[in-house]
Amino acid sequence: MKNVFNSKGKLVAGDSPLQVYPSTPPPAILKCRDIFSNCLLLRLLAILLVIIGTGTSKLYAQNAIVTENAKPGNPSSEWQISGAGDLSIQGFATDISYNKGETARFKIKTSARAYTINIYRLGYYQGNGARLQGTATVTATLPQSQPNCLTNSSTGLLDCGNWAVSAQWAIPSTAVSGLYIAKLTRTDTGGSSHIVFIVRDDASTSDLFFQTSDATWQAYNIYGDNNNGRSLYTGSGGKAVKVSYNRPFLTRNGGGGGGPQEDWLFNAEYPMIRWIEANGYDVTYTTNVDSDRRGNLIRNHRVFLSVGHDEYWSGAHRAYVTAARNAGVNLAFFSGNEVYWKTRWENSIDGSGTSYRTLVCYKEGSTGENTCNGKCDPTSNWTGLWRS
């Protein structure tokens, strides 16, 4: 059945969802370079070129995204915050993503004697942009004292993984994959902030596989618990060559070397999420981290979407995406400055040795910003420009 779009680019209800080429004709690689301005028409044309095919369409009502977005959303006045939020209550998830049915755990630093944690999923939801999914349980005795984050002066790494767990949320086994935010709100002052994490569906064979640019979120993140934070660009004592996922995000405030208009999810990922879900696409979500540690799952989908400021890719990340393309998966780059710096991953330094918690990029060579003008990564791996 032919799909019909209204004047706002929205798929008219009742039509079948867009279809995807299974493996022939050859996979397409599409790019929307101007991700930081309004290129909706180009995005739409690219999606149509990649996705419209001759395969058997799924029934519109069977699409989990359509069903989820039909539920009443919550207005942005309820879930949104200004910038990175209140610095007196900040936290992070113990992983950037969790499979549905797992438990998300949060480490939070605050002097508050009481606070709430509401969990929202980002989407369209009648234009509200998010829907309340539940509340997390505070497991720590409050007020909770957290130690100073661990640091390494030679690399600039700051790792707050030594903080104790403060709260948790049991992700329902029926949860819909997506970008989720835990909104932390102090009971006394009303100060609030966000913890961002992704809910995966590792068994999914959805048409679209949406990858966030979380490595870039961290590359520009300058969080430090004692005015000692560093990003891969700047910070107290100079730039870092290693940054940790065991930190709250201050990226939305800027100051980490780029700008909040370019380097955070509400710039590019969030508008794309709203558009995709408003139009009923069959989509599940993944991360830069997961494109490396479970990149084999990319082949289970018809289209791989790079969305946002997708600047930092590891070697395994690129190898998995290339292998998926060669196997017939279409690639669509709704991103800018993508696949620019080559990275590698290390374990955390918090004593747990948790994998995929440290992003490493020495910016080797002499081309690009903040380079070390040579081979400076102590390993044999190159962590400089991909194009050098």
Model feature map: region roles:
Residues 1-40:
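N-terminal secretory signal peptides that target proteins for export/translocation
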Residues 43-54:
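Bacterial N-terminal signal peptides
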Residues 61, 113-115, 119-123, 132-137, ...:
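Aromatic-Pro/Gly-enriched surface loop or interdomain linker
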Residues 66-88:
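Proline/serine/threonine-rich low-complexity linkers at boundaries of modular beta-sandwich domains
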Residues 90-114, 119-125, 130-134, 138-188, ...:
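Ligand-binding face of N-terminal immunoglobulin V-set domains in extracellular IgSF glycoproteins
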Residues 145-161, 167-176, 261-347:
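Helical hinge/lid and interdomain linker segments adjacent to catalytic or ligand-binding clefts
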Residues 339-388:
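An acidic, glycine-rich "communication" segment
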